[in-house]
Amino acid sequence: MPDEIRVSIAADADIVQARGVGRALASRLGFSRTDATLIATAISEIGRNILLHAGSGEVEISQDAEDHRVGIVVVARDQGPGIADVERAMREGYATGNGLGLGLPGARRLMDEFLIDTKIGHGTTVTMRKWRERDELERLREAAASHG
Protein backbone atom coordinates (compact mmCIF):
# COMPACT_ATOMS: atom_id res chain seq x y z
CA MET A 1 0.00 0.00 0.00
CA PRO A 2 1.46 3.41 -0.92
CA ASP A 3 2.26 5.92 1.82
CA GLU A 4 -0.73 8.02 0.84
CA ILE A 5 -3.90 7.13 -1.04
CA ARG A 6 -6.28 9.67 -2.53
CA VAL A 7 -9.88 8.77 -3.25
CA SER A 8 -11.97 11.16 -5.33
CA ILE A 9 -15.41 11.57 -3.77
CA ALA A 10 -18.28 12.09 -6.22
CA ALA A 11 -20.69 9.24 -5.35
CA ASP A 12 -21.62 6.91 -2.48
CA ALA A 13 -19.41 4.17 -3.97
CA ASP A 14 -16.41 6.47 -3.54
CA ILE A 15 -17.16 6.79 0.17
CA VAL A 16 -17.27 2.99 0.44
CA GLN A 17 -13.88 2.83 -1.28
CA ALA A 18 -12.39 5.46 1.07
CA ARG A 19 -13.76 3.58 4.09
CA GLY A 20 -12.11 0.40 2.81
CA VAL A 21 -8.76 2.14 2.34
CA GLY A 22 -8.95 3.52 5.88
CA ARG A 23 -9.91 0.16 7.35
CA ALA A 24 -7.11 -1.65 5.45
CA LEU A 25 -4.46 0.84 6.58
CA ALA A 26 -5.72 0.66 10.17
CA SER A 27 -5.42 -3.13 10.08
CA ARG A 28 -1.92 -2.95 8.56
CA LEU A 29 -0.82 -0.53 11.29
CA GLY A 30 -2.12 -2.77 14.08
CA PHE A 31 -5.20 -0.82 15.12
CA SER A 32 -7.90 -2.84 16.86
CA ARG A 33 -11.03 -3.77 14.91
CA THR A 34 -12.94 -1.29 17.03
CA ASP A 35 -10.58 1.55 16.15
CA ALA A 36 -10.60 0.52 12.47
CA THR A 37 -14.40 0.80 12.55
CA LEU A 38 -14.21 4.23 14.21
CA ILE A 39 -11.79 5.42 11.52
CA ALA A 40 -14.00 4.04 8.73
CA THR A 41 -17.08 5.68 10.26
CA ALA A 42 -15.34 9.06 10.54
CA ILE A 43 -14.27 8.77 6.89
CA SER A 44 -17.84 7.95 5.93
CA GLU A 45 -19.28 10.96 7.74
CA ILE A 46 -16.73 13.35 6.24
CA GLY A 47 -17.28 11.84 2.80
CA ARG A 48 -21.04 12.31 3.12
CA ASN A 49 -20.47 15.95 4.07
CA ILE A 50 -18.44 16.39 0.89
CA LEU A 51 -21.23 14.92 -1.26
CA LEU A 52 -24.00 16.81 0.52
CA HIS A 53 -22.43 20.25 0.69
CA ALA A 54 -19.85 20.40 -2.11
CA GLY A 55 -20.95 17.71 -4.55
CA SER A 56 -17.42 16.34 -4.90
CA GLY A 57 -13.98 16.42 -3.35
CA GLU A 58 -11.29 14.03 -2.22
CA VAL A 59 -10.17 12.09 0.83
CA GLU A 60 -6.47 11.47 1.35
CA ILE A 61 -5.49 8.71 3.77
CA SER A 62 -1.93 8.24 5.02
CA GLN A 63 0.07 7.06 7.99
CA ASP A 64 1.97 9.11 10.52
CA ALA A 65 4.43 8.16 13.22
CA GLU A 66 6.02 9.58 16.31
CA ASP A 67 8.46 7.91 18.71
CA HIS A 68 5.82 6.24 20.82
CA ARG A 69 2.83 6.01 18.47
CA VAL A 70 1.63 5.37 14.95
CA GLY A 71 -1.36 7.00 13.37
CA ILE A 72 -3.70 7.40 10.47
CA VAL A 73 -4.21 10.83 8.94
CA VAL A 74 -7.36 11.56 6.97
CA VAL A 75 -7.52 14.82 5.01
CA ALA A 76 -10.84 15.59 3.32
CA ARG A 77 -10.92 18.47 0.83
CA ASP A 78 -13.65 20.05 -1.22
CA GLN A 79 -14.17 23.19 -3.26
CA GLY A 80 -17.69 23.73 -1.94
CA PRO A 81 -19.28 26.79 -0.40
CA GLY A 82 -17.33 26.59 2.86
CA ILE A 83 -18.85 26.50 6.33
CA ALA A 84 -20.38 29.82 7.35
CA ASP A 85 -20.70 28.95 11.05
CA VAL A 86 -18.16 26.33 12.12
CA GLU A 87 -19.20 26.57 15.78
CA ARG A 88 -22.80 25.73 14.87
CA ALA A 89 -21.75 22.94 12.50
CA MET A 90 -19.70 21.37 15.32
CA ARG A 91 -22.63 21.24 17.76
CA GLU A 92 -23.91 17.79 18.63
CA GLY A 93 -27.25 17.13 17.00
CA TYR A 94 -26.73 19.63 14.19
CA ALA A 95 -27.54 17.83 10.96
CA THR A 96 -28.41 18.88 7.46
CA GLY A 97 -28.40 15.51 5.70
CA ASN A 98 -29.30 11.85 6.04
CA GLY A 99 -25.99 10.23 7.01
CA LEU A 100 -25.62 8.45 10.32
CA GLY A 101 -26.40 11.80 11.91
CA LEU A 102 -22.91 12.05 13.34
CA GLY A 103 -21.66 14.68 10.92
CA LEU A 104 -18.65 16.78 11.83
CA PRO A 105 -19.12 16.53 15.63
CA GLY A 106 -19.38 12.75 15.42
CA ALA A 107 -16.28 12.47 13.25
CA ARG A 108 -14.43 14.69 15.74
CA ARG A 109 -15.55 12.47 18.61
CA LEU A 110 -14.38 9.29 16.82
CA MET A 111 -10.87 10.57 16.09
CA ASP A 112 -8.09 11.82 18.37
CA GLU A 113 -7.35 15.05 16.49
CA PHE A 114 -9.70 17.10 14.33
CA LEU A 115 -9.12 20.40 12.53
CA ILE A 116 -11.34 22.35 10.12
CA ASP A 117 -9.98 24.92 7.71
CA THR A 118 -12.77 26.58 5.73
CA LYS A 119 -13.15 29.65 3.58
CA ILE A 120 -16.51 30.86 2.32
CA GLY A 121 -16.71 30.37 -1.43
CA HIS A 122 -13.49 28.36 -1.58
CA GLY A 123 -14.16 25.11 0.24
CA THR A 124 -13.26 23.18 3.33
CA THR A 125 -10.41 20.96 4.46
CA VAL A 126 -10.89 18.64 7.43
CA THR A 127 -7.81 16.96 8.89
CA MET A 128 -8.31 14.07 11.34
CA ARG A 129 -5.86 11.76 13.11
CA LYS A 130 -6.25 8.56 15.08
CA TRP A 131 -3.29 7.31 17.11
CA ARG A 132 -2.22 3.92 18.45
CA GLU A 133 0.52 3.56 21.04
CA ARG A 134 3.49 1.50 19.90
CA ASP A 135 4.55 -1.35 22.12
CA GLU A 136 8.15 -1.75 23.26
CA LEU A 137 8.90 -4.50 20.74
CA GLU A 138 7.80 -2.29 17.83
CA ARG A 139 10.05 0.51 19.04
CA LEU A 140 13.04 -1.84 19.38
CA ARG A 141 12.51 -3.32 15.90
CA GLU A 142 12.31 0.12 14.32
CA ALA A 143 15.41 1.29 16.16
CA ALA A 144 17.33 -1.81 15.01
CA ALA A 145 16.13 -1.38 11.41
CA SER A 146 17.23 2.25 11.31
CA HIS A 147 20.70 1.37 12.61
CA GLY A 148 21.26 -1.75 10.54
Sequence positions of predicted segments:
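Bergerat-fold GHKL ATPase/HATPase_c domain
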Residues: 1-41, 141-148
